[in-house]
Amino acid sequence: MTYLEIEGTNHLSGNVTISGAKNAALPLIVSSILAKNEVKINNVPNVADIKTLISLLENLGAKVNFQNNSALLNTNTLNQTIAKYDIVRKMRASILTLGPLLARFGHCEVSLPGGCAIGQRPIDLHLLALEKMGANIQIKQGYVVASGNLKGNEILFDKITVTGSENIIMAAALAKGKTKLLNVAKEPEVVQLCEVLKDAGLEIKGIGTDELEIYGSDGELLEFKEFSVIPDRIEAGTYLCAGAITNSKITLDKVNATHLSAVLAKLHQMGFETLITEDSITLLPAKEIKPVEIMTSEYPGFPTDMQAQFMALALKANGTSIIDERLFENRFMHVSELLRMGADIKLNGHIATIVGGKELNAADVMATDLRASSALILAALAAKGTSKVHRIYHLDRGYENLEEKFKDLGAKITRLEE
């Protein structure tokens, strides 16, 4: 097993280039199932989740060429509609194949998903929506077995769901007639999926709002244009927190600051200043790091995927910070590891109270999920001594060239084999 060795209390400086968004690339790659032509996608991050999804598509018969952050996808050769457990178990996003496979072929079987062990993350909302569109759905031996010709309908999501919105948008693209979706997720990743489908000829209204109207093509495949994946706002936020926790000046390149409004607002409240251009953000050191109150919510609110990183940053603040996690249960699994480094954090249900300003000391810590592992790296950057972060396969699922990027900023970080 590999681990990261990190020497703390070093200043960072320089530039880091932000990769394409993993959470945008996943549904965009899946959307190639709706294409009549070969689809070229640029700025695709070379991370484990992307490779897992490509394996899944190849398993279904697609031809995929992925190199130099560009993916060339041909789904005309699809000859299989069963997404098998041994691939799906590695990653939740595999459930995204359900809507497009069903819409294109009229039947499919998709194993119930795996991925990070964060809360329940139920897929009932996906299934209820597909049933409303005329699908017959059964759960058999750990598989979602779906069949039927999809027809447009009005669908209200009881809760905002990002993957649910994406799945049903793709299903509605090939369905017969108009689908009206209410309480749709407004995340930039969902917006890009809609824009790409619109460019491919789909009639879709309300992009960027919580209400979409999609006029399905009744089974006719779409003609995709070449496009690039949007920058990863969570990766960007993580590097901003790395600059902040070491109180350093760093610049992020190839980033979209408008997608980071909530994160930047909290950094400003904590005493940091930023210089923003069309595609860069420079973080300036704070005179004093102030405590902060954060409540996670759906976009454009504060992202749950940045909660762990800000908890690490709050350990350096001069005072007591509060983090209220509203979206997922079990999303404080990093707390026990931060305590090993000398953190003062108290949990009460979904609320964490962080007393900052105490010295952090290096320790051996273990990552439990993708974003928790990045919080441990941030804490290690600020801790006195050399820390080891274990189970970093979680990091490899979502961060491209992580240690190289940190090294470019001057961090002392090494990947080693146990």
UniProtKB/Swiss-Prot annotation:
GO terms for biological process: cell division; cell wall organization; peptidoglycan biosynthetic process; regulation of cell shape; UDP-N-acetylgalactosamine biosynthetic process. One of its GO terms (molecular function) is UDP-N-acetylglucosamine 1-carboxyvinyltransferase activity. Keywords: Cell cycle, Cell division, Cell shape, Cell wall biogenesis/degradation, Cytoplasm, Peptidoglycan synthesis, Pyruvate, Transferase. Pfam families: EPSP_synthase (PF00275). UDP-N-acetyl-alpha-D-glucosamine binds at residues 92, 121-125, 305, 327. It catalyses: phosphoenolpyruvate + UDP-N-acetyl-alpha-D-glucosamine = UDP-N-acetyl-3-O-(1-carboxyvinyl)-alpha-D-glucosamine + phosphate. The keyword Nucleus does not apply. The keyword Metal-binding does not apply. Phosphoenolpyruvate binds at residues 22-23. Its EC number is 2.5.1.7. GO terms for cellular component: cytoplasm. The active site is at 116 (proton donor). It is found in: Cytoplasm. It comes from the Bacteria. The modification 2-(S-cysteinyl)pyruvic acid O-phosphothioketal is found at residue 116. Pathway: Cell wall biogenesis; peptidoglycan biosynthesis. Belongs to the EPSP synthase family. MurA subfamily. HAMAP family: MurA. Cell wall formation. Adds enolpyruvyl to UDP-N-acetylglucosamine. This is UDP-N-acetylglucosamine 1-carboxyvinyltransferase. It comes from Campylobacter jejuni subsp. jejuni serotype O:2 (strain ATCC 700819 / NCTC 11168).
